[in-house]
C-alpha cells in the first residue's frame, strides 16, 4: 500500500497518457498495468468539456487523475496551468513540470522550487518532476511537496536509471514518497528502481510506443510487483568469493 498525502494506492506503478495510437488502446494499457494514478497533460485536453477524447475514457476507467503542467517554461506558467486544472477537474493534485528546453526536456530546478512553494501555499498537493539532485529534492520536501519525482534519464529516452547513484541518496534521505519518473524504458528498469527503495515509478513512453502496449503494461505491472517483493524477502548479501550451493566433497568421502 502506497500513501501520498490524502490518498492510498495498491499499485506502485503510475502511468501517463501520451503517445498512444488511440484512446481505446490507452485505456486498455492502463487497465492492464493496474495503475491507479494517471498523469494527464493539460495542453492535450479540452478542459471545457468532459467528453474530451482523452479525458472521458479516463474518467470512465475510474483512475485518479494527476494533471501535469508539461509545456510550462516558467513558474508563472505552471501556476496558471495548475489553477486551470483545479477548476476544470476539481482536484488539488498536480504533477509540476517546468522544462524550458524542448530538446532535452530537463526540469528547471529554480523555477520548479519557486512554483512548488507557491502552489503548496495555495492548497495544491504537489508532486514535482525534478532532476536527480538530492539537495533539490530535500528542498522540495521542505516546502511541502507530497512526493518528489526525480528523473532516471531524460523524458522518453528509455535509457533506464542513468542517475542511479543520486537516486539512492534521494531515496535514503527522503521522508516523502520517491517516484522515479522519466527514462524508464523496460520493465527491468522499473524493478531496479523499486529494489533500490523507490516508492513508485511513472512510465509512459515505454508502454505507449511498444509494439504491444497492453502486454508491455502487464510486463511493467509484474516487474513492479517483483521489485517490491524482492527487498521484502531479504535477498542474500553480495560476496567477492564463490560459495558452493551444495557440498563439494561429501559424495567422494561417502564412496571411500
UniProtKB/Swiss-Prot annotation:
Q: Which UniProt keywords apply?
A: Cytoplasm, Schiff base, Thiamine biosynthesis, Transferase
* Example GO molecular function: thiazole synthase activity
Catalysed reaction(s) here are: [ThiS sulfur-carrier protein]-C-terminal-Gly-aminoethanethioate + 2-iminoacetate + 1-deoxy-D-xylulose 5-phosphate = [ThiS sulfur-carrier protein]-C-terminal Gly-Gly + 2-[(2R,5Z)-2-carboxy-4-methylthiazol-5(2H)-ylidene]ethyl phosphate + 2 H2O + H(+)
Give the Enzyme Commission number. 2.8.1.10
Q: Where is the active site?
A: 95
Identify the main location: cytoplasm
What the entry lists under CDD domains is as follows:
ThiG (cd04728)
Give the record's pathway.
Answer: Cofactor biosynthesis; thiamine diphosphate biosynthesis
What the entry lists under Gene3D superfamilies is as follows: Aldolase class I
An example GO BP is: thiamine diphosphate biosynthetic process
State the compartments where it is located.
Answer: Cytoplasm
Binding locations of 1-deoxy-D-xylulose 5-phosphate = 156, 182-183, 204-205
State the GO CC annotations: cytoplasm
Quaternary organization: Homotetramer. Forms heterodimers with either ThiH or ThiS.
In UniProt terms, what function does this protein have?
A: Catalyzes the rearrangement of 1-deoxy-D-xylulose 5-phosphate (DXP) to produce the thiazole phosphate moiety of thiamine. Sulfur is provided by the thiocarboxylate moiety of the carrier protein ThiS. In vitro, sulfur can be provided by H(2)S.
Q: Which family does it belong to?
A: Belongs to the ThiG family.
Give the protein name, as stated in the record: Thiazole synthase
State the species of origin: Escherichia coli O157:H7
Whichever gene encodes this chain, its name is thiG
